[in-house]
A protein has these predicted regions:
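Predominantly flavin-linked oxidoreductase catalytic cores and closely associated redox partners
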Residues: 2, 9, 76-126
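Short beta-strands and strand-loop turn motifs
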Residues: 61-65, 126
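Short gly/pro/ser/thr-enriched loop/turn and capping motifs at secondary-structure boundaries
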Residues: 2-5, 15-16
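Short active-site-adjacent helix-start/loop capping segments
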Residues: 16-18, 26, 61, 69-72, ...
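Short beta-strand to alpha-helix junction loop
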Residues: 37-47, 64-84
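Aromatic-residue hotspot detector
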Residues: 27, 53, 69, 100, ...
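Glycine-rich active-site loop/strand segments that organize a redox cofactor
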Residues: 12-62
Length: 126
């Protein structure tokens, strides 16, 4: 499969990156149990998301309803920014269908795909 396949079709091909409001406002507007997003939204609030994409070559704009899109109106710009950041951080990308999660003493230690099994020393939960 292709990297970013689902991302490229979001927002009618434009990709709504975030909302131009506080993390608190976003959490308050999640219809059911937004608590599971609390730590993620505080680690990556909209300001940091906008900064990240700007630093990676994807200028953003705010439209009605505080929705934030790439200035290009193309989700491809969002994917290219993510790929640029991955290259800079030497991230290896594997695209394969996941068959299962590998655990060691109840701790996630990898993922099993149709191609291979990939292990890790740890998984960081934010």
């Amino acid at each position: 499969d292709r990297l970013g396949k689902k991302l490229l079709i979001t927002g009618k091909g434009r990709c709504n990156v975030t909302n131009d409001c506080s993390a608190q406002e976003i959490l308050q507007n999640i219809p059911r149990n937004g608590r599971f997003l609390y730590s993620t939204m505080n680690a990556f609030p909209p300001e940091k998301i906008k900064e990240f994409f700007g630093e990676n070559g994807c200028a953003l704009k705010t439209e009605r309803g505080n929705r934030v899109f790439p200035v290009s109106d193309r989700s491809q710009s969002v994917l290219e920014a993510l790929q640029k950041a991955m290259r800079r951080h030497h991230v290896d990308v594997v695209t394969a269908r996941v068959k299962g999660i590998v655990t060691d003493n109840g701790v996630v230690s990898g993922v099993r795909t149709e191609k291979d099994t990939y292990t890790c020393k740890w998984v960081r939960y934010i």
